[in-house]
Amino acid sequence: MKIFELSIQCWNVSCIFTNINGFKYSKLDNPLFFDHVSRHSIFGLIETQHTSDDIDKLQVLGYKCFQACRKKLKYGRKHGGIAVYVHNSLLPGVSKIATTGSETVQIKLDRDIFSLDRDTVISFTYCSPANSSYVQRTQLDTYEDLEQKLSCLGQDVDIIFLGDFIARTGTRLDYISGEDNTDMPDVYDYHIYGLS
């Protein structure tokens, strides 16, 4: 019997790519960012704002990327997008669950491979704000969409939810008081070589 210790994380990265002086840079190319995310056997990046043209730029050595993206409109900027990374050593026990749309990526951990009581589904989700142009245009109720996808999983699986659920807390704290927030460094320092 194999015993696995999984480290699973998820972050809203508010755009995986940055355009600096006409050059496109990926946060995945930043050594600090990559060092942090690569400590986890499974990690999800939410609101990557990528399109199908960017999929090859999302690949990370040693990981399989499962992604969902929205179509780029003729005018306007990119929105949404999810990229889920699974370390190659775990791939025999992980499968992507086919879903429609670009708001959710679900993967299933096989109970036999991971020595679990039941199969476990990890749902990485981005819920667009209700007043966003995307929701206004598509009339998508992201919570209803998520509920529909979860109802298809059945009763014999455990489910883990990760993502950005656009929770509004009003005047209450939307974080745990006293929590150590040094887990994910803010990464905005891009070293650009050859530019002055």
Where are these regions (language model features)?
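A shared catalytic/ligand-binding motif for oxyanion handling
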Residues: 1-196
